[in-house]
Amino acid sequence: SENILRNRWVLAVSGTHGKTTTSSMLAWILDYAGMAPGFLIGGIPENFGISARIGNIPDSPISQHRNINERSPFFVIEADEYDTAFFDKRSKFVHYHPRTAILNNLEFDHADIFADLSAIERQFHHFVRIIPNNGLIVSNGTDSNLKRVLAQGCWTPIEEFGVKTGWHTEVQPNNTIDIYFNENYQGCLHWHLLGEHNRMNALAALIAARHAGVPIAAGIEALAHFKNVKRRMEERGTVNGNTIYDDFAYNPSAIQTIIQ
């Protein structure tokens, strides 16, 4: 973090589920806007074909910048709550010092290092407290565990998604999505991704990108060209008329979400 993230606008994506997909969406939105972000993602976004890059301006094929030594100020990182090392039991994400942080969701996980849910909540509380007051927390407004974490103390502005009093979606025919902030219509997203979880991921990415300077309309346009991540509802073929998908979901709630 000292060598790569220092003096950069870090956008960190945390949560039990959806980190990889949301990080990929966010990196793609910024890249589509010509901001050429660096990123470190726990999967391979098909828009990039790689899981990490430093983020020099020419990394973006649509960038108009000409200085080949100029580094993008933006860096998107998948922010995991797993411990840092055997000699540092703090969660990895406390080292990233983000200016923009997404809190996708929170439930018990990593039973090998956390005794219970409250132990994970404590780490998320530490994470929330390092985000500056000129930053932004983008939080899932439907998650009671995240609400409990934020109630412990937070001095950063918060924008919620998934609730009528914040950012939310309405599904229309042909897999199109109307996007709203409160009751104000923001635009319509036409895309091929399925599921409520991906709509929530998209909202989080749009809000975070907006904080970094990308208008919502531009973010929606970018997501229309988003190709998802390998092994995230990846279509592998058809057998006897049945479409076969490959997905990385590994715990009960994630598997349930994918099946739904």
Please describe what each predicted stretch is.
Residues 86-89, 112-114:
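Conserved ATPase-coupling elements of RecA-like P-loop NTPase cores
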Residues 5-8, 27, 32-35, 47-49, ...:
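Acidic, Mg2+-coordinating active-site environments of NTP-dependent enzymes
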Residues 12, 39, 76, 137-138, ...:
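Short catalytic-loop micro-motif centered on adjacent basic/acidic residues
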Residues 74-84, 244-250:
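Switch II (G3) loop of P-loop NTPases
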Residues 248-260:
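AMP-binding/adenylate-forming catalytic core of the ANL superfamily
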